[in-house]
């Protein structure tokens, strides 16, 4: 599919319509007392829309990317104006303060962490102060990856937000030019968890998944292994040329798009494609 200006306008318009919409919003918050029962924007000065924190983060990534690719669209001007107002140091400081709360060490791990790094990387490609404002938040999540990966004994393979291969793909892309030690740590973790995987049975899809566990793992190993990937892949999915396992080549059935979890399967079909 070729991304046209019309597609870009429709995507960006839809996302802009909910980035600042505070309700409904699903908080990831441990209440320490009645004083914590505050509106979402009080806890998250930037990422308080789009139903939840990580959706707001990757919504920002989407509109910035579209604005860079199609800078002359009217909606791109709207995006830049919104970013000028929201991606500022004082609001980033509020997001950082939330990370310092008790019980926040696992907040948005690993999906939101990775998407924040992707957002920062995209912001760096714009002639604007947004990346500099976001940098302290990106560095905070990079440090969380540094602390977390060495103690993560087993990989999370589910096709939902907890999928570690997907998170490492985004984090590695950010780290390669900004934190080589983190990139090295990611490569070592990927090899430790996945290098010996053979004859994947692809027990997917799960009922509410939006990622292919098998294909996301393969994508990560492609960037980690480089020229050694072909041999690994031939052992990991030895019958892929025969479209086996068949489940990987069969679109998922989405029985009820009004169900927010089941509707994830639309995302699975898109991410597989």
Q: Can you annotate each of these PLM segments?
A:
Residues 1-48:
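Low-complexity, Ser/Thr/Pro/Gly-enriched N-terminal "stalk/linker" regions
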Residues 3-5, 40-57, 97-114, 151-164, ...:
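Solvent-exposed loop and edge beta-strand segments that line ligand/cofactor-binding
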Residues 11-24, 78-97, 103, 135-153, ...:
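Long, well-ordered core segments of solenoidal/helical folds
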Residues 18-35, 53-55, 61-84:
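Alpha-helical solenoid scaffolds in large eukaryotic transport, assembly, and signaling factors
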Residues 144-217:
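Loop-centered beta-sheet repeat module
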